[in-house]
Regions:
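Acidic, His- and aromatic-enriched active-site or binding-groove loops in soluble protein domains
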Residues: 58, 92, 189-212
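Second-shell loop/turn segments in exported
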Residues: 79, 118-119, 138-150, 180-183, ...
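Structured segments of extracytoplasmic/periplasmic soluble domains
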Residues: 82, 94, 107, 135, ...
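Active-site-adjacent loop/helix surface patches within enzyme catalytic domains
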Residues: 44-59, 64-169
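Acidic/histidine-rich, metal-coordinating catalytic segments
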Residues: 168-183
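Bacterial N-terminal signal peptides that target proteins for export
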Residues: 2-30
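C-terminal motif of bacterial Sec signal peptides marking the signal peptidase cleavage site
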Residues: 39-40
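Short acidic, glycine/serine/threonine-rich helix-capping segments at coil-helix boundaries
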Residues: 216-280
Length: 281
């Protein structure tokens, strides 16, 4: 192709000089100019050359939260939904005997896992969180599927690494239901938050402090609903502040109880829930 192009520009070597038109005398110069232009384009860098030898101190990670979910489906279905649909997560932990951790979205990019929710007043949590899905069916009738010890062990390792990379605070390691208590229940009451806390991951309470608050509340009586609403907001939850035990407040109380008192999560104010709220920092 190049040879035929040059032949067209320069003409045939056997053609007599008197047969050429005057305009043909310019063609060699034009061809050389075209070749020079092509050479220049070929050598131009495809991206802007950057000097990365200096790094600014004034920066931090975009990641502030780690959010945990259950998939409500098996591994094959979960992988398909999370990789081919309009929902995704950064990581997926399987339920194999020896669980596997898939990275589906790079931590530098947003995964679509959080949806509508809020934590400590911040919404649009997809932009500031790492999402981890765990293969688990969630509720099965009136029961909840437990998480295997192997899953939890792998999850602890994964969260520890992510939290260290991004300096994620303990109170910002949450469940989907913590950020979206009006519409979500995952990772559910079967999720072992206390076991994670014993491994140094997430926020938990001191049992002796809870016992002291419980004894005090037994004497003074149960606080009113507005007290519960204010305390729930203090520890991160989006909850109404009108002093009424409405459905929205019940849902937030139930989400809190699933996380910190999973033995009973009826969404009703009680002394133990009040004591745990008081003990949390």
């Amino acid at each position: 192709m190049i040879a035929s192009y040059l032949g067209t520009v320069f003409g045939s070597a056997s053609a007599p000089a008197f047969a050429r038109s005057p305009g043909r005398a310019l063609r060699p110069a034009l061809a050389l100019a075209a070749l020079a232009l092509l050479a220049g384009c070929a050598s131009a860098p495809k991206t802007v050359p950057l000097d990365t030898s200096i790094t600014a101190q004034g920066q931090n990670s975009r990641v502030r939260y780690i959010m945990l979910h259950y998939t409500a489906g098996d591994t094959a279905r979960s992988l398909k939904v999370l990789s081919q649909g309009q929902v995704s997560s950064h990581y997926l932990i399987t339920d194999d005997r020896v669980p596997k951790a898939y990275r589906l979205v790079d931590e530098t990019r947003n995964a679509w896992h959080a949806g509508d929710g809020s934590w400590y007043g911040q919404s649009w949590l997809n932009t500031s969180s790492i999402g981890i899905e765990i293969v688990n069916m969630g509720p099965i009738g009136t029961q909840w599927q437990p998480y295997s010890d192997a899953q939890v062990s792998l999850l602890i390792r994964l969260i520890r690494e992510i939290a260290a990379r991004h300096d994620v605070k303990p109170q910002h390691i949450i469940g989907h239901s913590d950020a979206s208590p009006q519409r979500k229940t995952d990772p559910g009451p079967a999720f072992p938050w206390q076991k994670l806390a014993q491994a140094g991951i997430g926020r938990w309470y001191d049992v002796n402090t809870v016992a002291q608050f419980s004894a005090s509340l037994a004497q003074t009586g149960l606080p009113d609903v507005l007290w519960f609403q204010r305390e729930l907001a203090r520890v991160g939850y989006a909850v109404p502040q009108h002093g009424q035990l409405d459905r929205a407040t019940i849902n937030v109380l139930a989400a809190f109880q699933m996380h910190y008192r999973p033995a009973r999560y009826d969404g009703q104010p009680d002394i133990e829930t009040a004591a745990i709220l008081s003990a949390l920092e």
